[in-house]
Amino acid sequence: MSCDLLVVGGGVFGLWIARHAAQRGLDTILIEKDRVGSGASGGLLGALIPHLPERWDAKKKFQFEALSSLPGLVRAVEEETGLDCGYRRCGRLMPLWKESFADIAAKQTAAAQQNWNTSETGFTWEIVERPPSEGWPAADAMPLGLVVDTLAARIDPRSYLAALRRSIESRVRIIEGEAFVACADGVVETSAGKRIMAARTMLSSGYETFPILGQMLGGDAASYGRPVKGQAALLEAELDDDLPLVFHDGTYVIVHDGGRVAVGSTSEQRFDAPFSTDAALDTVLDKARRLCPAIADAPVIERWAGLRPRAIGRNPMIGVLPDHPDIVVATGGFKITFGIAHKMAECVIDLATGGAPELPESFWLSSHLKSGKSKTGNN
């Protein structure tokens, strides 16, 4: 078995890499150790949240461009497949409950006008006294008003992944239930004993990429990144699909289509049971119900836990592996991957085909490797 491009990992990043590769005519294979969308990408939240508009830099500009371009790409996937991705630019509400937060938010309003180019894009970051819909969020959560961010959006993670998969099925060979084991001289071995000759291999299997980097570059997995546990829940509640998502003190409340509301999430550096929910999620649910009384009595229909990849330098990790010119790492992203996966994937394909993509310096593998050396004192 052979291909131009082998993608390791069937999450949102891997699917977008495969889609861009197929669109460019590359013979592509995607392998996934479990099933496509079974990892962190197949969660519940689907929040597409911009960075703060102040202290503008290349990373924030990259994300802004990605969030701005995503609606058109989602529509294209939906038209091709006939599947709904559950995308909506719903905006975000952030209650202000400290004077210091209100002062900072006022400065961010001006920054958004400039950096989000409000006069042309229409995207705003404004302070208002009352929410667009009474009780969303609760009045006692916002004694100083709230910020309304109109750039933020939401997408249904599982519907999105299903549509992306459908969009590539006729052009990409998808192999599920087989994991990456090793790669040497352009031949990848899978856990089922398959040997795949690949001109280029993309490592995009989330946190499971970090042990592979340790295997190929030396050192342990933690030298390159680590998994961070997140827990979330899905509630049943008939609410207006247009309601903005609410973010307050680390808690998200996101209305999705079909009478569902996603709530989350935890961010756990230490954990014993990575895929089990516990009292930490109960705490998040309690906060969410107080924050948005409309879901106070909404029944929980699903509890979810998963592991997100946090690279050593926190930002996405992209680059050709040292001494392995045919292997490209494409992982990380942590909490922002869903909103930028399509743009990162395009850059990765550019890199794999001899191009020179414009990426923030902090995204490059070389930057992460320097960060890792600095943190371990091996300057």
Question: Where are these predicted regions, by residue range?
Answer:
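N-terminal Rossmann-like FAD-binding beta1-loop-alpha1 element of flavoenzymes
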Residues: 3-29
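Short hydrophobic core segments
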Residues: 6-8, 196-208, 345
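Active-site substrate-recognition segment that forms the wall
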Residues: 16-24, 33, 44-52, 83-88, ...
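Dinucleotide-binding Rossmann-like beta1-alpha1 core, especially the glycine-rich loop
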Residues: 46-135
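Helix-loop-beta segment of a Rossmann-like dinucleotide-binding subdomain
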Residues: 54-55, 83-94, 120-166, 266-270, ...
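C-terminal catalytic lobe of FAD-dependent flavoproteins
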Residues: 298-379
